Structure formats: structure tokens, C-alpha cells
């Protein structure tokens, strides 16, 4: 009888162990949740990504969002910008402020910023002289990093599940655009100007974030030509370098072709 009693007492304990194991196995790990969020962003399902992010944050699991954002930037995913934009306009501004690098918030909020080319440490500006169309050539300034010559802000445009940006220069009230003509220094690279209007895709840009030596950087591409914004190798008497559109692959070289976006 003692054996029977002991056996009867052991059965509930074993059953409880089975139930506990089953519950644990049904609970998704943080890695699973990160993978699902990451994949939602990569496939362009931004509404789902925003819902997941808001849910994780409300449950005290914001580290999931933080890790996904870090991985997106390290992997140089353009979709990072769309995800950030949809959070910004979809009740997720606090998530952007908390888990994205500062530069993302500056871009989305339309704050005044400086665009500094990493390779030469020069800030983007528009020249003082104009052509017959009242356009100004864009340069990297050899000295200035503090006046409104190098002050810009971004205006967002959402189209076909993508976010694009118009870059507005504070000093001259003009928009950064890429010319249809090429630079005389390189027959493949296009000249970059500031112009009064912003009614075509030549005045629209998209960003690809990257990380290099712990710095958050951006490749800046023109929507119409898909050329990356860069500064040329030729230096004028003022120490300025002309801005052009690079006709070629740049994503593998963030140390050369990327930009810092910093507060003005």
C-alpha cells in the first residue's frame, strides 16, 4: 500500500512538470520576435512592423526594437528609413527618439542639419554665384561648418511604400537637385545644384544607413538617377570640392562615399 501511495503522489508532480515544459516551449524567444520584426521590415510590411514595435515597447520589451534597429543599420538596409518614417507618423515617435540614432530623429522632424562628407570632413553648401537658370553649384566647404551656408533640412515624401526626401538649403531657400548633364571632371558623374523648384524626382533623394568605426553614416542617392552624392577630388582655391553624383557602386565603401547628418 505504501508503494501505491507514493506512486499516486508522484503522478501529479510529473504531470505538473509536463505542463510547465509545454508552456515554456510555446513562448517565443526574443530572438524569434526580433527575426519576425526584422523580416516584416525587409518585406515592406511596415504597418505590421509598427504594430509589433508599439506592442513590444508597451510590454517592456523595447530591447527587441533596439536590437533590430542596430542590425538594420549594420546590414545597410534602406528599409530602415521607411520603418523609421512609419513609426514617426504612426504614434511611434517616442520609439524613434529612444532606439534610433539621433540623426534619424533630425531627419524625420525636419530639424536643421549639416551634411558632412566623411572622406574629406567638409560640409555641403551651395555656391554664391548662379547660372542663367538661377541654379547654384553644390560644394563641400573647405572651411565653414557653422553658418547658415551649410544649414539644411529634409522634407519627407511617401510614395509607393518608399520614403524620399527633398533637401532644402536654409541660406538660399533652394532645393538640392541632380543635373541631367555630367561634370567636366568626369564624363560619368552628374553635377549637383541648388534650384528654386522641387517638382521632379531630380530633387528627391533616398538614404541608405550604414555603420563604420562605430559612426552612423548615410549614403545619399538621387531618386531619378540612382547616383550617390559625393564630393569630387579636385580642390579649388577656397578649399572647396564640387558635389557630384557618383555613377557606380558605393555601399561597400562607407569610409569614402558616406555622409554624417548632424545637428546644425
From Swiss-Prot:
Q: Which Pfam families match?
A: Lipoprotein_11
Keyword Lipoprotein appears in the UniProt entry: yes
Task: Choose one Gene Ontology CC annotation of this protein and give it.
Answer: extracellular region
Per UniProt, the keywords (alphabetical) are: Lipoprotein, Secreted, Signal
Identify the stretch annotated as signal peptide in this record. Answer: 1-16
Localization: Secreted
Where does the protein principally reside? Answer: secreted
| InterPro entries, A to Z | Lipoprotein_11, Lipoprotein_11_N
Which family does the UniProt entry place this protein in?
Answer: Belongs to the 30 kDa lipoprotein family.
Quote additional remarks: This lipoprotein belongs to the group of structurally related '30 kDa proteins' that comprise major protein components of the fifth (and last) instar larvae and of pupae.
UniProt protein name = Low molecular mass lipoprotein PBMHP-12
Amino acid at each position: 500500500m505504501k508503494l501505491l501511495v507514493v506512486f499516486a503522489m508522484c503522478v501529479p508532480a510529473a504531470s505538473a512538470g509536463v505542463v510547465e515544459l509545454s508552456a515554456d516551449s510555446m513562448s517565443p524567444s526574443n530572438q524569434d520576435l526580433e527575426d519576425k520584426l526584422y523580416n516584416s521590415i525587409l518585406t515592406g510590411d511596415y504597418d505590421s512592423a509598427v504594430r509589433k514595435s508599439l506592442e513590444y515597447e508597451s510590454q517592456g520589451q523595447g530591447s527587441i526594437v533596439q536590437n533590430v534597429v542596430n542590425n538594420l543599420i549594420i546590414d545597410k538596409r534602406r528599409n530602415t528609413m521607411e520603418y523609421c518614417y512609419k513609426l514617426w507618423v504612426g504614434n511611434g515617435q517616442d520609439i524613434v527618439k529612444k532606439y534610433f540614432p539621433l540623426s534619424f530623429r533630425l531627419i524625420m522632424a525636419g530639424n536643421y542639419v549639416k551634411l558632412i562628407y566623411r572622406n574629406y570632413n567638409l560640409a555641403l553648401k551651395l555656391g554664391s554665384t548662379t547660372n542663367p537658370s538661377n541654379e547654384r553649384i553644390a560644394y563641400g566647404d573647405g572651411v565653414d561648418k557653422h553658418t547658415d551656408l551649410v544649414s539644411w533640412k529634409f522634407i519627407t515624401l511617401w510614395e509607393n511604400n518608399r520614403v524620399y526626401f527633398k533637401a532644402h538649403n536654409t541660406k538660399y531657400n533652394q532645393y538640392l537637385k541632380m543635373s541631367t548633364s555630367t561634370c567636366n571632371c568626369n564624363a560619368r558623374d552628374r553635377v549637383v545644384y541648388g534650384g528654386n523648384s522641387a517638382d521632379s524626382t531630380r530633387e528627391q533623394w533616398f538614404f541608405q544607413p550604414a555603420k563604420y568605426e562605430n559612426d552612423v553614416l548615410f549614403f545619399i542617392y538621387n531618386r531619378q538617377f540612382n547616383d550617390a552624392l559625393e564630393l569630387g577630388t579636385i580642390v579649388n582655391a577656397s578649399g572647396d570640392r564640387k558635389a557630384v553624383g557618383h555613377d557606380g557602386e558605393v555601399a561597400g565603401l562607407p569610409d569614402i562615399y558616406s555622409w554624417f547628418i548632424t545637428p546644425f
